Swiss-Prot record:
List of glycosylated residues: 127, 194
Sequence ranges on the Cytoplasmic membrane side: 393-431
GO cellular component: external side of plasma membrane; extracellular region; receptor complex
Organism: Rattus norvegicus (Rat)
Record has Secreted as a keyword: yes
Domain Ig-like C2-type: 27-110
Protein name, as recorded: Interleukin-11 receptor subunit alpha
Length: 431
C-alpha cells in the first residue's frame, strides 16, 4: 500500500512538473547522440528521439517491461522525472501507440560548472600562456571558451570597444589540454583573460587581469656543463647557455644564479655569476659536486625560473698547478690567455735591482723638479716682501717723531753719566 502511494505521489509530482515545463523545448544534443543530462535533486525531461513532437508514446526502462509513463499522460513524446538521483541514471525506451520502437535515451547526472581556476605565465617578453583547471569535477562533458583583450586606461571609454583592444580568441594548444597561448603581447600592457567553462547544465566564467612583467618566468638555462680545472684540486668551471625560448635582445637580458654542493652534503652554496660561466674556487677536493643554475630577467621583472637539471663534476686530482708542464695546461690557461689578449695585464714587479742608470730626462721627473722650484721661489719672494715692508715701516716712523731714549736710558741716572754736568738747582748755582 505504501509503495503504491509513493508511486502515485511520484507520478503526481512528475505530472505537475511536466505541466509547468510543458512549453519548454527538449534539451539540445550535447555530446554523443541519444544522451541527455541532469542534475541530482532536480527534475529532468527526456524526449523520444524517433517521433514527431507531441506524438503520444509509452516509456519503459531498458530491460524492464514495467510502464513508466503511458501515452495518455498528456506529455506527448516527453518523459518528466522529478528529483532524480543516481538510481535514475540509465537508458530509457519509448514506443508509439501501436508498439513501434521510437528510440532510446540515456540519462547521465552531473553538476553544473564552477568557476575555473586560471593562472598565466610568460617564458619570454613577447608571449604568454594561460592554463586552467575546473573548479569542481562535474562528471559531464565540458568545453572551454578562451579569449583575451587589452585593457584600456581609466577614462578611455572610446577605446574600450576598439579593434585594437580586442577581444580576440586565445588559441588553445592542440597538444596540451587546458592551455591557450597569446602571441605578440606588449610587455608593458595589461590584459584581461576570459576562460569560460561550459557543460550541458550551464556555464561559469573566470576573468583574470595579467601584466607581462609580473608573470614573467623564463625557462631554466640549458647546456649546463661542469669541468675540472687541471692543477687546481679545489676548482670547478661551470658554463651554460640561454634557454631556447628566450630571444636575446640588448634590452632584454637574463641574469643567473648558481648553486653547488659536494656529494652527501645537503646545504647549497649560492653565487650570482656575471655572464654564462662561473669558476668555483672553494670546492671540496676529491668529492663530486652537483651544480644547478636558474635565470631571471636582468631588471628583476617576474620571478626566478625553475632550476636546471643538476650537472656533476669532480675537481682535478692531478699534480698542483706549478707542477703541470706547459704543454698540458687545461681550460684555465685558455681563459687566462683570452683575457690577456682582450686586456693585457701589467707586468709583475721584479725583486732584482735595475742596473740601468736613472734617466733624468724623464718628462715626469722634469715636471716634478720644475714644480718644486716654483714653490720654493714663491715662498722666498713672499718672505722677502714681508721683511722689506717691515723695514720701510720702521724707517718712516723714526723720521716723523722725536727720538726715543736708548735702551739703557731708563736704567742710568743722567747725573751719573761721565762728562755730563750736574744741572740741578742749588743755592750755590744762584749765588
Amino acid at each position: 500500500m505504501s509503495s503504491s502511494r509513493s508511486g502515485l505521489t511520484r507520478v503526481l509530482v512528475a505530472v505537475a512538473t511536466a505541466l509547468v515545463s510543458s512549453s519548454t523545448p527538449c534539451p539540445q544534443a550535447w555530446g554523443p547522440p541519444g544522451v541527455q543530462y541532469g542534475q541530482p535533486g532536480r527534475p529532468v525531461m527526456l524526449c523520444c528521439p524517433g517521433v514527431n513532437a507531441g506524438t503520444p508514446v509509452s516509456w519503459f526502462r531498458d530491460g524492464d517491461s514495467r510502464l513508466l509513463q503511458g501515452p495518455d499522460s498528456g506529455l506527448g513524446h516527453r518523459l518528466v522525472l522529478a528529483q532524480v538521483d543516481s538510481r535514475d541514471e540509465g537508458t530509457y525506451v519509448c514506443r508509439t501507440l501501436d508498439g513501434v520502437f521510437g528510440g532510446m535515451v540515456t540519462l547521465k547526472l552531473g553538476s553544473p560548472p564552477a568557476r575555473p581556476e586560471v593562472s598565466c605565465q610568460a617564458v619570454d617578453y613577447e608571449n604568454f600562456s594561460c592554463t586552467w583547471s575546473p573548479g569542481r569535477v562535474s562528471g559531464l562533458p565540458t568545453r572551454y571558451l578562451t579569449s583575451y583583450r587589452k585593457k584600456t586606461l581609466p577614462g578611455a571609454e572610446s577605446q574600450r570597444e576598439s579593434p585594437s583592444t580586442g577581444p580576440w580568441p586565445c588559441p588553445q594548444d592542440p597538444l596540451e589540454a587546458s592551455r591557450c597561448v597569446v602571441h605578440g603581447a606588449e610587455f608593458w600592457s595589461e590584459y584581461r583573460i576570459n576562460v569560460t567553462e561550459v557543460n550541458p547544465l550551464g556555464a561559469s566564467t573566470c576573468l583574470l587581469d595579467v601584466r607581462l612583467q609580473r608573470i614573467l618566468r623564463p625557462d631554466p638555462p640549458q647546456g649546463l656543463r661542469v669541468e675540472s680545472v687541471p692543477g687546481y684540486p679545489r676548482r670547478l668551471h661551470a658554463s651554460w647557455t640561454y634557454p631556447a625560448s628566450w630571444r636575446r635582445q640588448p634590452h632584454f637580458l637574463l641574469k643567473f644564479r648558481l648553486q653547488y654542493r659536494p656529494a652527501q652534503h645537503p646545504a647549497w652554496s649560492t653565487v650570482e655569476p656575471i655572464g654564462l660561466e662561473e669558476l668555483i674556487t672553494d670546492a671540496v677536493a676529491g668529492l663530486p659536486h652537483a651544480v644547478r643554475v636558474s635565470a631571471r630577467d636582468f631588471l628583476d621583472a617576474g620571478t626566478w625560473s625553475a632550476w636546471s637539471p643538476e650537472a656533476w663534476g669532480t675537481p682535478s686530482t692531478g699534480p698542483l698547478r706549478d707542477e703541470v708542464p706547459d704543454g698540458s695546461r687545461g681550460h684555465e690557461q685558455k681563459l687566462e690567455a683570452a683575457a690577456q689578449e682582450d686586456s693585457p695585464a701589467p707586468p709583475s714587479p721584479s725583486l732584482q735591482p735595475d742596473p740601468r742608470p736613472l734617466d733624468h730626462r724623464d718628462p715626469l721627473e722634469q715636471v716634478a723638479v720644475l714644480a718644486s722650484l716654483g714653490i720654493f721661489s714663491f715662498l722666498g719672494l713672499a718672505v722677502g716682501a714681508l721683511a722689506l715692508g717691515l723695514w720701510l715701516r720702521l724707517r718712516r716712523s723714526g723720521k716723523d717723531g722725536p727720538q726715543k731714549p736708548g735702551f739703557l736710558a731708563p736704567m742710568i741716572p743722567g747725573d751719573k753719566l761721565p762728562g755730563i754736568p750736574n744741572l740741578q738747582r742749588t743755592p750755590e748755582n744762584f749765588s
